[in-house]
Design a protein with these regions (language model features):
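Short, Lys/Arg-enriched N-terminal segment that forms or immediately precedes the first helix
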Residues: 2-15
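Short helix-boundary/capping micro-motifs
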Residues: 30-40
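Central "turn" residue of the DNA-binding helix-turn-helix
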Residues: 44-46
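Residues within the DNA-recognition helix of helix-turn-helix
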Residues: 53
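Residue cluster at the C-terminal edge of the helix-turn-helix DNA-binding motif
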Residues: 59-64
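Basic, amphipathic "hinge/linker" alpha-helix immediately C-terminal to the N-terminal HTH DNA-binding motif
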Residues: 68-93
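Helix-turn-helix/homeodomain-like alpha-helical modules used for DNA recognition
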Residues: 86-117
Length: 117
């Protein structure tokens, strides 16, 4: 029998879900590629869906996540706002701490069950 495990997904909420692993991944990809369109393509997501994810998250959070400019002679691009960088850093640190805590208490909570499997 396989060893028992747990799964933890970290999501932030206001009145609605506003930030989670999908938004974080999208922002990291935009940061690397400097383009929401390229990030959406790499993640095999429609560009319109990527924009909806960003807009919904921005609306729930109350601040912008991206600075963007349309294409043209110099080309367009998208860059994370200072608030987006702070949010990503805080979110990832918080999630890592929660996973560490979960790991530390998992055996205490379920070790007895592990012996029965």
């Amino acid at each position: 029998m396989d060893k028992m495990k747990y799964n933890f997904t970290c999501r932030l909420f206001t009145d609605t879900k506003c930030f989670g692993p999908g938004v974080a991944q999208l922002l990291h990809t935009v940061d690397r590629l400097h383009s929401l369109r390229a990030a959406a393509a790499e993640m095999e997501m429609a560009y319109s869906k990527a924009w909806n994810i960003i807009r919904n998250s921005e609306a729930a959070l109350g601040f912008k996540l991206l600075h963007s400019s349309t294409g043209g002679k110099g080309g367009g691009g998208a860059f994370l706002t200072e608030d987006a960088v702070k949010l990503l850093t805080a979110y990832e640190g918080f999630c890592a701490s929660m996973r560490d805590y979960g790991d530390s208490i998992f055996d205490d909570a379920f070790g007895w069950l592990e012996r029965k499997l």
